[in-house]
Curated annotation (Swiss-Prot):
This protein's UniProt keywords: Hydrolase
SMART domains, per database record: Lactamase_B
GO molecular function, one term: hydrolase activity
Record Gene3D superfamilies: Ribonuclease Z/Hydroxyacylglutathione hydrolase-like
Protein's recorded name: UPF0173 metal-dependent hydrolase Lm4b_01588
Family label: Belongs to the UPF0173 family.
Endoplasmic reticulum as UniProt keyword: no
Domain of life: Bacteria
Length: 228
């Protein structure tokens, strides 16, 4: 399995002949190396409804026929407002089997809304995501602040990789993310959600260096991947 990082919180997971795109903020994202019109994933997974995470989901899903996995409220919005038909609604605490493995949604402390035709639309609760693929557990925290139940996430799902936001201001910053890494006890910690715009400017290498002894961190450059 290969997991690659494409700026902000966009990651791509390739397992066998299946491609999973997570939070595909591509158009308008100078930090992303992908082109929306070239993406043909089998699945798109969304952590929440903010524009810098939903991104190009509608265009990509319509072009590729990808199944969109997300919280039930966001799923309803994408179906009614954008005409998406191939959607797998879920909610926090639930898990579901797919052809590539299992998805479980966890809590996240953030918001989830968009503006459509001049009105603010609430798109349900934000989530984190635990993927179980090829007997590996990958935690994608989404946008969140630090919370103590991250310990429970790590205990229930021994983690091979954890993707954690470090940008501060809208999510936890590097100091809190280092505590999150301590709580989760993942084999590998990868920072995300930083340097896309000035308010979330951070030094990811400094974050990795700050991790507790025994916790391994890795900064993925744009387009770089890891094999697990």
């Amino acid at each position: 399995m290969k997991i690659s990082f494409h700026g902000q919180s966009c990651i791509k997971i390739i397992t066998g002949d299946t491609t999973i795109l997570v939070d595909p903020f591509i158009s308008g994202n100078e930090k992303c190396d992908l082109k929306a019109e070239e993406q043909m994933p089998d699945f798109i997974v969304l952590s929440h409804g903010h524009d810098d995470h939903v991104g190009d989901t509608v265009e990509i899903a319509k072009n590729s026929g990808a199944t969109v996995i997300c919280n039930a409220d966001l799923a309803s919005f994408l179906a009614v407002e954008d005409g998406l038909e191939n959607i797998a609604p879920m909610h926090i605490g639930g898990k579901r089997q797919f052809s590539f493995g299992q998805v479980k949604l966890t809590q996240a402390f953030h918001g989830s809304q968009t503006v459509r035709d001049g009105r603010i639309v609430n798109l349900g609760f934000p989530t984190g995501i635990v993927f179980t693929i090829e007997d590996k557990n990958i935690y994608f925290a989404g946008d969140t602040g630090l919370f103590s139940d991250m310990k429970l996430i790590g205990e229930l799902n021994p983690l091979d990789v954890a993707f954690l936001p470090i940008g501060d201001n809208f999510t936890m910053g590097p100091e809190d993310a280092a505590i999150a890494a301590r709580f989760l006890q993942a084999k590998l910690v990868v920072p995300m959600h930083y340097n896309t715009f000035p308010l979330i400017a951070q030094d990811p290498h400094k974050f990795v260096a700050s991790l507790d002894e025994g916790i391994t961190g890795k900064v993925l450059e744009i387009g770089e991947g890891i094999e697990i």
